[in-house]
């Protein structure tokens, strides 16, 4: 009878020790990779040169403020030097930034915003990497 009790205790202790070992492959993943996007993390200024059909590029500056207001400046490089400005409010939902008055959204990524197409999907193709606004906080 003692043998059964000792053996059961040994098996229990063995399982306890084995369960404490973390052998998962994702245990070394950087914690910042999966940080929940919050309003405070995206406040600042973003710059980028978006593709343009009939001009060299669309120089874009997007400023997001803490009171949920945004200012978006476009300059059509090589066409019209006057900036086109849009002001409104912004909303963050499930990692996507929606600017009031615009039909498209931005996907929030570390230190950048990636413009999505009108259906809310990532833009694909040769110019996909140019639909990015990078955080500069000027």
Regions found by a protein language model. Give the residues of each.
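Sec-dependent bacterial lipoprotein signal peptides
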Residues: 1-18
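Extracellular/luminal ectodomains and secreted, surface-exposed scaffolds of diverse proteins
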Residues: 88-90
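Lipid interaction determinants
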Residues: 9, 18-85, 98-138
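Short, conserved beta-turn/loop elements at beta-strand boundaries and strand-helix junctions
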Residues: 93-97
